[in-house]
Amino acid sequence: MHTAYVPVPAPVRPPSAERWPLAAVAELFELPFLDLLHRAQQVHRQHFDANTVQLSSLLSIKTGGCPEDCAYCPQSAHYDTGVDADKLMPLDEVVRAARAAQANGAQRFCMGAAWRSPKPHHLEAVAEMIGAVKALGMETCVTLGMLRDGQAEQLKAAGLDYYNHNLDTAPEFYGKIISTRTYQDRLDTLQQVREAGINVCCGGIVGMGESRRDRAGLVAQLTNMEPYPESVPINNLVQVEGTPLAGAETLDPFEFIRTIAVARITMPLAKVRLSAGRETMSDSEQALCFMAGANSIFYGDVLLTTGNPQVEADRRLLQRLGMRAEGLPCAAGQA
């Protein structure tokens, strides 16, 4: 497959957030499923090509040994998950991975490091990686944990397009998942990113035992940011043996799709990213996510340390749906 890069327009900055009280978001979740999808698809078509998705690739540039105790995370040093801590990946390996992702059709390259917060020398190395990936013509995103004063500006100077820092869940449920980092810590980092002029990538995880009201609370937090994030990844919990959430009750797929739809309705200009958890979804469930307004997928066999549908399976799915990758002239995988 030929995957010559076609530039993608810069994201449209969302306007000042329309206020969505928690009660109004919760009402969306209560709509009949088909009514909710119809409304989400209408909103989606007002702002995007409904048959186009952006392909993103995610690379763990520093795996394991994280001091945080996020109950879902196999990279936490608090849990025995079989994930060993390693050092920061060398620049040449990162560039090689980015080239491979681009050759497979990805236009967006995300780099994640299992840190509580990056040290100055680490940030200098990441800045080099950002520059090298940007030189390939790819959109860049990093997730490095909490940022200290001046670090967001350093990343901006390196050319970073997006910084990912998820809220994970609603404030009311947050304490059941994480104790080593406060909700306000997350909001403070997001504010630094916004003030530095970097696009915000912020979403959450569902299927951690939260209620529907908690899922509404997460979306309400996101949509009422000023402005709401340009990029909203919605993750379905990937249960990893050794983490506290291993063995949690599996979320009804319709609830996950509802979350995608409500995110699309309340954040109409955002890229809503179908993120972790796709490996366990059927093709039909993924198609419903696209119907609900998801317009980006993470592409590649591994997301950080967890599985993801194989590249060829994604190509076949997009072909069957008559969808295409953003910036490419035809459905992914077609000649």
Curated annotation (Swiss-Prot):
<dbReference type="InterPro" id="IPR006638">
    <property type="entry name" value="Elp3/MiaA/NifB-like_rSAM"/>
</dbReference>
<feature type="binding site">
    <location>
        <position position="70"/>
    </location>
    <ligand>
        <name>[4Fe-4S] cluster</name>
    </ligand>
</feature>
<dbReference type="GO" id="GO:0009102">
    <property type="term" value="P:biotin biosynthetic process"/>
</dbReference>
<dbReference type="Pfam" id="PF06968">
    <property type="entry name" value="BATS"/>
</dbReference>
<feature type="binding site">
    <location>
        <position position="273"/>
    </location>
    <ligand>
        <name>[2Fe-2S] cluster</name>
    </ligand>
</feature>
<dbReference type="InterPro" id="IPR007197">
    <property type="entry name" value="rSAM"/>
</dbReference>
<dbReference type="GO" id="GO:0051537">
    <property type="term" value="F:2 iron, 2 sulfur cluster binding"/>
</dbReference>
<dbReference type="InterPro" id="IPR002684">
    <property type="entry name" value="Biotin_synth/BioAB"/>
</dbReference>
<protein>
    <recommendedName>
        <fullName>Biotin synthase</fullName>
        <ecNumber>2.8.1.6</ecNumber>
    </recommendedName>
</protein>
<dbReference type="InterPro" id="IPR024177">
    <property type="entry name" value="Biotin_synthase"/>
</dbReference>
<keyword id="KW-0479">Metal-binding</keyword>
<dbReference type="InterPro" id="IPR013785">
    <property type="entry name" value="Aldolase_TIM"/>
</dbReference>
<keyword id="KW-0004">4Fe-4S</keyword>
<dbReference type="GO" id="GO:0051539">
    <property type="term" value="F:4 iron, 4 sulfur cluster binding"/>
</dbReference>
<keyword id="KW-0808">Transferase</keyword>
<keyword id="KW-0411">Iron-sulfur</keyword>
<keyword id="KW-0001">2Fe-2S</keyword>
<dbReference type="Pfam" id="PF04055">
    <property type="entry name" value="Radical_SAM"/>
</dbReference>
<feature type="domain" description="Radical SAM core">
    <location>
        <begin position="51"/>
        <end position="278"/>
    </location>
</feature>
<keyword id="KW-0949">S-adenosyl-L-methionine</keyword>
<comment type="pathway">
    <text>Cofactor biosynthesis; biotin biosynthesis; biotin from 7,8-diaminononanoate: step 2/2.</text>
</comment>
<feature type="binding site">
    <location>
        <position position="73"/>
    </location>
    <ligand>
        <name>[4Fe-4S] cluster</name>
    </ligand>
</feature>
<feature type="binding site">
    <location>
        <position position="141"/>
    </location>
    <ligand>
        <name>[2Fe-2S] cluster</name>
    </ligand>
</feature>
<comment type="function">
    <text>Catalyzes the conversion of dethiobiotin (DTB) to biotin by the insertion of a sulfur atom into dethiobiotin via a radical-based mechanism.</text>
</comment>
<comment type="subunit">
    <text>Homodimer.</text>
</comment>
<dbReference type="GO" id="GO:0005506">
    <property type="term" value="F:iron ion binding"/>
</dbReference>
<dbReference type="InterPro" id="IPR010722">
    <property type="entry name" value="BATS_dom"/>
</dbReference>
<feature type="binding site">
    <location>
        <position position="66"/>
    </location>
    <ligand>
        <name>[4Fe-4S] cluster</name>
    </ligand>
</feature>
<feature type="binding site">
    <location>
        <position position="201"/>
    </location>
    <ligand>
        <name>[2Fe-2S] cluster</name>
    </ligand>
</feature>
<keyword id="KW-0408">Iron</keyword>
<keyword id="KW-0093">Biotin biosynthesis</keyword>
<feature type="binding site">
    <location>
        <position position="110"/>
    </location>
    <ligand>
        <name>[2Fe-2S] cluster</name>
    </ligand>
</feature>
<dbReference type="GO" id="GO:0004076">
    <property type="term" value="F:biotin synthase activity"/>
</dbReference>
<comment type="similarity">
    <text>Belongs to the radical SAM superfamily. Biotin synthase family.</text>
</comment>
